[in-house]
Amino acid sequence: MRVSRRTGTPRRSRDSGDTVAAFFTVTENLLKTKPFQDITVAEIITRTPHSRSSFYHHFDGKVDVLVALATSVLDNAYRGPGLWDAQPGRSRARAMHASIGPTIAMWTDHGDVVGAVIEQMHTTPVVAQVWKETFDKFVTAVSAQLTQQWIHEEITFPASSATMATILVCGIERTFYVSSRGLDRRLPAPESAVEAIEWITLTAVQGRKPQNMAPAAAVFSPQPHLERAIDGTSTARAEQTDSTADSILDALRSLLLEAPLDKVSVAKITARAQVSRSTFYFYFDNKNAAFAALYRGLAEAAAAGLRRLHTIDRTNASLVETTLTEWLQIDDHAVAIMRSALHEWPRRAELRTVYREGMSAMADILESILIQDRTDGVALAGPPPDQFAAVLLWTVERSIAGALAGEDHLDDLGQVISSLSALLTSAIYGR
């Protein structure tokens, strides 16, 4: 089998199966121990009985191995009639539910491969195309179901059915990614997210409280980790800075308005901040550490914005939706930081820690609100509040990432924000 870089699809020969399978197995095993960008072709080859010439007979490089391996995983996961083959209506609704099973199996058995694809898709177009083909099939199928249901039930959302379908599929993608990678304590495994995913999907499809899902317990006891969210104290580590460190971060912030993080160097930062290289390294270990500090400030501001929900009358759904919309609004400087953060955090260790802290702080806040409002009878009984809060926020996070990347059906950031606000309000409080 030889992979075409232009199409990302393998050309098979009858006698190549065992050789290719060996390269696949070694690559998948390596992905369990290190990120894809740190794997070399030499590592792949030396862990098989095959030669370098044999490797290059089948592949142009390690990216081609990932493309072919991911293609195989996706083909096997969704082999046979799929969600997209069912007719819109009850048949497709059943197929939407049934598709969760093979999706969980794929992430459970091959999460390292699919995770590597997710991490590389914003920087490597041929990898992105592999994922996009399956992603788009789900979006098209869910969009058709939404269109039919909305017309029949006279339901409206701020966005088109294609945009809402994309938001739903984005949420599922990101939720399974973080749960399979162990990146969110609220979602220890893909199975833990299923109830929340189905609730959110049915909210979009039905536009009201999902009728065919058993409600969770109506009363929950706050956990110790939630008390910090309720009293308004930030859980993120405080940064000790002075005016020089602030100047460095301001310089980085302004450079991000001009270029993504990959294109910003320490030399450019020091020149813009008018400090020496040694001064930069006195405050920060490297560029990634400086960006992590910059993002921490943004994450703390985002948590403070979400905390405003504690101060409003949440029996007023319109006020809740307005507050959520205001929380999600992003100015130009924040867009520049978020665009790099959203796309880079899975691949950069320094940023990943800070990013998870920020997401966890917001989940604490939303979970505490869910518990309080369910206890007071304001919010709908639904999925467990810890898992529900996590899935809602990862859906927001991935959808905003897609909007900032200009992905299909998410190119209008304002519409995406309005849709997310409406979806969260409906999922938590009903229509």
Listing of model-derived features with the role each one plays in the protein:
Residues 19, 23, 62, 69, ...:
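Hydrophobic/aromatic residues within well-ordered alpha-helical segments
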Residues 105-109, 115-118, 125-151, 162-166, ...:
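Amphipathic alpha-helical packing segments from all-alpha helical-bundle domains
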Residues 64, 68, 82-109, 161-168, ...:
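Hydrophobic alpha-helical connector segments
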Residues 30-64, 68, 255-289, 293:
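Helix-turn-helix
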Residues 59, 119-124, 284, 343-348:
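Short helix-capping/turn signature of helix-turn-helix
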Residues 17-43, 47, 224, 229-268:
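Short, amphipathic alpha-helix enriched in basic
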Residues 1-7, 140, 144-148, 166, ...:
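C-terminal peripheral helix-coil segments that are non-catalytic and often amphipathic
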Residues 81-88, 114-121, 149-153, 175-183, ...:
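Secondary-structure edge/capping motif, primarily at the C-terminal ends of alpha-helices
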